[in-house]
Every structure is written in structure tokens, then in C-alpha cells.
Amino acid sequence: MKRLFLIILSMLTLTSCVDEVQFDNTPEGNMEALWKIIDEHYCFLDYKAETIGLDWNEVHARYRGKLNKNMTSPQLQEVLCNMLAELQDGHVNLYTAADVGRYWAWKEGYPSNLNDEIRESYLGNDYRIAAGLYYRILDDNVGYIVYHSFSSGIGEGNIAEVLHHLRLCSGLIIDVRGNGGGQLDYAQRLASHFTNERILVGYRSYKTGTGHSDFSELSPEYLEPSTTIRWQKPAIVLTNRGCYSATNTFVRDMLCCPNVRTLGDSTGGGGGMPFTSELPNGWLVRFSACPQFDKEKQHIEFGISPTIPCELKTEDVLKGKDTLIETARELLGKR
């Protein structure tokens, strides 16, 4: 991860140190600076022109007309946040002293396919906790792991202890619904326990210039097998629209592992490595700087479809049951 960050930093530095334009600390200057940062360094402009019809030049003209020199900071923030929302990217944020501008439509407006209270009932009161992993053996001898956030650290020892405890189970459910991401290292560390060999899981590319199409050749990404205990039985990963960023990458990687399927809804996406830049007034903008792809060289920015589509049914919720968990248990029981 540190090496990846340094590569991104060097690419952004190389593409921004020539003929750098200095903008005034005015509403117009800050808007122009923000638009230019995205125009030269955001990694999905061409892709989103194709998929959602984004025209970044048209966006510039439209939002430039919303400015006036006497507008307040909250008014400017609203205009700039609305402009950034045109990118439809949850990795894009505007940080000010008063608020964080954000885009959450990647999960809002979709069924959550998750009832937290019911999920907690499956864990019960006697579940185990290994760092960020909550786990237990269900009464049909299926192992069940909940990982709420990849911001919660896990070590090799934690994962090994969990899998050792679940070793006699007939199968394993890994529930990452609602996991909005975190550290890629933790996502890759967990996935490494589900392959016995080095496998290709996807690709990444880097900006090499200020043009929308200025990218390096695709660089392959591999998943290395863990040197400790590795899971050899069927496993199902439960997903929903709340799976974003590092969780999106985790799902991508797990789909490349033998004996692993995903069940639920499409993930929320988030297929770009984020980077941060500063506006003249000191506000910070975070944006996607280099894109990730799956092993078929397809974008994962707008999410990954499940192997087995499944929705949380209202009639099951009324019975205190989770349709996704019950379906996964049934499938694992047949293997």
C-alpha cells in the first residue's frame, strides 16, 4: 500500500508541476481550481462520459453561472459540492471547517437488504470477537463471520484463530453487508486465506498526464496465499449496496478464489484509489486518482454483481429471519 501511494503521488506530481496556474481565493478562483483538479487528475472522466453521459466542460459552464463574488462560504460550498456530485463517486469529498461534502447515492435509494437487529440475533450473545471479526458456529454447523468495517484492523493471527475455531464447519458465511471500506491491506489479508496459490485478481492503471485518457498500461494485481491456515471448504460472501471501496475490492478478490461465491445485491462500487488536493481557500478535495479493474479488465467503479442474486424478504423479516443468511445456509448444506 505504501508503494502504491508513492506511485500515485509521483504521477500526480509529474502531471501538475508544469505550467501550474495559480487561482485567486475568490468564489470564482476556488471553483476554477476545483474544476481543473478534477479535469486533470480525476481518473473516471472518460468512463463516466460513456456510462452516465458526463460532460465535464458542460458542468464547468453550468456551475460557473451559479457563482457571484459576494456569496458566503456555505453558499460556495453548496455549489462546489453539487458540482462534484455530478461525478457520482463516493470517493469524492469536499472538506471544509464546517462540513464534509459527500455523495452517498451509491447506496441511498436502493434496498439495504440488511436488518441490523436480525443480523445481531444470528450472532447471539456468545459470539467471539477477534479484532474486527465477529464470529460463531450456527446450529447447522455453518461458520458465520461478520466484518463491519475494514477500518477495524485484523492480523494474520486473528484470522488463523477464527478459521481454526470454525475448521469443523461444513461451510462458511462471511457477511460484509454495510461494510463501507477501510484499509485495503486488511481486505487482502482476509482474502489471502481463501486461495492456495498466487492468483490474478485484477488490474490497476495510473494517470501519466493531464489528459482524460492519459493512463499507464494496466498493471496486474495478484493475491498471494496466506502462509498460515487457509480455508478449503465452500464459502459464501454476503453483499449489498453498502459494500464500498476496500470492501468492493475484497469482493472482487474473493470471486477469484476457488469455492467462493457471493450472494445478495450488487456492491456499491468505489473502484478508484483516492487522493487529496487543496483549494486556494484551504478546503480539501478528495477524488479518485487511479482506477481498479477486475481480472477481465472491466471497471468495478459502479459495483460488482453477485454470483447469486438474493433480496431480504419482508415476510422473513417479520419472522425474525434474514433471507440472505438462510439462503446461504441452505446452499452450503447442499454442498
Predicted regions and their residues:
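Alpha-helix termination/capping residues and helix-transition junctions
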Residues: M11, L166-L168, I229
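C-terminal "post-core" interaction segments
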Residues: V18-D39, P74, N141-V142, G171, ...
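Sec-dependent N-terminal signal peptides
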Residues: L6-L9
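Flexible, low-complexity junctional segments that flank or bridge functional domains
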Residues: L4, C17-Y206, S213-S219, P234, ...
